[in-house]
Regions:
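Active-site-proximal loop/helix segment associated with metal-binding centers of metalloenzymes
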Residues: 108
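An N-terminally biased module of ancient metal coordination in phosphate/nucleic-acid-related enzymes
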Residues: 1-92, 97, 103
Length: 108
């Protein structure tokens, strides 16, 4: 399916990354009310398993399951496709985690 550029937002942060506000469903409800978006992608700052580089802007590793659940529950609400993603800083020592867990096991 093709969308116009203004029908898609793939860089959205909720309260999970500490500098966003509101729950995922809140963003979907606002998008529906405004009637502009067809696709809304969440890209919370990816947690690191050992909490390195945690400056208060990442979700906690323990929140990954809740984050995934909230995105999946919101998908399709109001006719909006909701996508699960993560904003990752490239850290060479974490390449295996990004590849195996976020991309592989969790399917980001």
């Amino acid at each position: 399916m093709r969308y116009r550029y203004n029908e898609v937002n793939l860089h959205t942060h909720s309260y999970y990354c500490r500098h966003g506000k509101g729950e995922i469903v809140d963003y979907v409800n606002v998008a529906k009310a405004k009637g502009l978006l067809k696709v809304l992608g969440f890209s919370e700052h990816a947690p690191l398993p050992d909490r390195t580089l945690d400056y208060g802007t990442r979700m906690a590793y323990s929140e990954l399951d809740d984050y995934e659940r909230d995105v999946k529950r919101a998908d399709g609400r109001g006719g909006i496709k909701v996508l699960l993603g993560a904003e990752c800083d490239w850290i060479e020592d974490e390449a295996g985690y990004y590849r195996d867990e976020l991309l592989g096991e969790r399917g980001y």
